[in-house]
Amino acid sequence: MISTKEKNKIPKDSMTLLPCFYFVELPIVASSIVSLYFLELTDLFKPAKVGFQCYDRTLSMPYVETNEELIPLLMLLSLAFAAPAASIMVAEGMLYCLQSRLWGRAGGPAGAEGSINAGGCNFNSFLRRTVRFVGVHVFGLCATALVTDVIQLATGYHTPFFLTVCKPNYTLLGTSCEVNPYITQDICSGHDIHAILSARKTFPSQHATLSAFAAVYVSMYFNSVISDTTKLLKPILVFAFAIAAGVCGLTQITQYRSHPVDVYAGFLIGAGIAAYLACHAVGNFQAPPAEKPAAPAPAKDALRALTQRGHDSVYQQNKSVSTDELGPPGRLEGAPRPVAREKTSLGSLKRASVDVDLLAPRSPMAKENMVTFSHTLPRASAPSLDDPARRHMTIHVPLDASRSKQLISEWKQKSLEGRGLGLPDDASPGHLRAPAEPMAEEEEEEEDEEEEEEEEEEEDEGPAPPSLYPTVQARPGLGPRVILPPRAGPPPLVHIPEEGAQTGAGLSPKSGAGVRAKWLMMAEKSGAAVANPPRLLQVIAMSKAPGAPGPKAAETASSSSASSDSSQYRSPSDRDSASIVTIDAHAPHHPVVHLSAGGAPWEWKAAGGGAKAEADGGYELGDLARGFRGGAKPPGVSPGSSVSDVDQEEPRFGAVATVNLATGEGLPPLGAADGALGPGSRESTLRRHAGGLGLAEREAEAEAEGYFRKMQARRFPD
């Protein structure tokens, strides 16, 4: 019984099934049958007359009457048609039952075909397959018979019993056979005209062609439909039909109905027709492939396209626009995302552009605090690279005041411990590192040594791997570079000067500690020092200290730093304020400083610093540090100290000013500003407030400037 699921299965509709059957297949088969009638049962078409030899013994074999043959023609047609057709019907019926009960209509060894509605009738798979396979078999039989008859009529070769039924009258020739042995005239005197006509059609043997076609066709059907698990069933059926075909052909030889060559040729013709029809007419008896719906074209991702469009617009912007925010506002409040930077060759270490934007978390009702350092002056040893993707990077920096206190205290303790180690003459400041996880003092010393080794390897191998938090390293002779070590997680980011990288000859790992110790001692002796110079100038001063005063060192200098406090440790008025300081050196000859202050402007030295740097043949970033004038500095402040928190009293939104370091244009009026960390301050936050300049401040600044010049004179005595 057919399951309910299959009964309720909706069949497909076909508009071409019945028209193709009625107007194509049936007319072809009918025309073949009609043609066979005229060729076999009538004398309408006469075979060609071919000459023979006088008294040819190969044509004088005994004649066997048609009714006395072992396999007469009618029996041959019935066997060649009935046996294969019956076998196909039985096999299809069994297959349909097995598919319905065991596998269902969607499975089965021979494939599955669903029902089709055509002309208001439902045709199941059994009916459709049976009609198709049996119909092709009938058409093949007719085609084989037609081909055989046409060849026989065209050739007109004689059968072995031709002279027996012809009974030639040699006296009608007028000459003897000795003179002319080959006879082309019709001198037959026999009374059985039908026998004489049949004796002229022997090549190829009709029994051989029809039997071979039936055997090959049904054997291919068995091989395709019957599974190999049936063991001997399939070989038995195949061999049975092959033997039957062979017997039909051989009987024609034994009864002198055909020559052996006629039988062999008939076998080849019948087998060829069967193989062609089985492969191309019925598709090797397999179910036609189901029509799969065309897969819809993948819809274009609008969000992805919009994101890519935004990235393209940012990366293709003008190189001088370094204060643009590269990340969407919604992503500034989330977890930090990694910055992708592709690894390039050794030339990328000397690239002419580094632009790192450090963005603090967006505060409510205020803009984000951003400090940007940009330097794209061309290098003398390498061409300038204008890849916008390398110029713009956005790093989200979450800060924690408690973590900042701990890191500052650890750094000061290490600086005090390094006082007893001595100060080499060629000592240089260290690099700025962004710690991402708490470490003990012993672990930090080990990491410093490992970082020094890594820096030496990176100079030979290639650029540093990308990461979220940058590391600014001041390398003697090559200028500072930005390294992004792979740090995981969103811990706070505080820039603290540490041990110097051993990048040049004659430098020791302890030189940085000695330099910081001497700075602290000098600051303590100064008494009343300038209060809190900005963190910006500290970074520039440190990056300037180890570099050469020549144009090449000035052109290769670049650094980045940012510090900001968490919004939960600040008052509402402080959280609403914003500050953006940008040093943009995209211009080919003069660097430009963009200043955004919320009411209390930064105070810069007059244009003498820039003019001096220009006169020396290059732009010295250290001049910017020497040109800064700030408020009162408490005791213990050193040029390398971290940034401290002070109260911020600017309006909520500030204006943006542009200062040309080379010409001094656009300099704001002299005022007060603050920056570096004092002993009593522990939070690393960039703050600014107005204040006056005192005599003690200028003396401390003059002493620091003298020390810087003295250090440079010692490093470069020539």
From Swiss-Prot:
Gene Ontology molecular function: any one: phosphatidate phosphatase activity
Amino acid composition bias (Polar residues), ranges on this chain: 314-323
KW Phosphoprotein (keyword) present: yes
UniProt keyword list: Glycoprotein, Membrane, Phosphoprotein, Transmembrane, Transmembrane helix
Sugar-modified residues: N169, N318
GO cellular component: plasma membrane
Top-level taxon of origin: Eukaryota
Membrane topology annotation: Multi-pass membrane protein
Subcellular location per the Swiss-Prot or TrEMBL entry: Membrane
Residues annotated with Phosphoserine modification: S322, S353, S428, S508, S641
Alphabetized SUPFAM superfamilies for the sequence: Acid phosphatase/Vanadium-dependent haloperoxidase (SSF48317)
GO terms of biological process kind: phospholipid dephosphorylation; phospholipid metabolic process; signal transduction
Residues with the Phosphothreonine modification: T376
Predominant cellular place of this UniProt entry's protein: membrane
Low complexity: bias regions: 545-571, 664-680
Compositionally biased residues, Acidic residues: 439-462
One Pfam family, short name: PAP2
Membrane-crossing residue ranges in chain numbering: 18-38, 70-90, 133-153, 207-227, 233-253, 263-283
Family affiliation: Belongs to the PA-phosphatase related phosphoesterase family.
Name of this chain's protein: Phospholipid phosphatase-related protein type 3
The organism of origin for this protein: Homo sapiens (Human)
Gene: PLPPR3
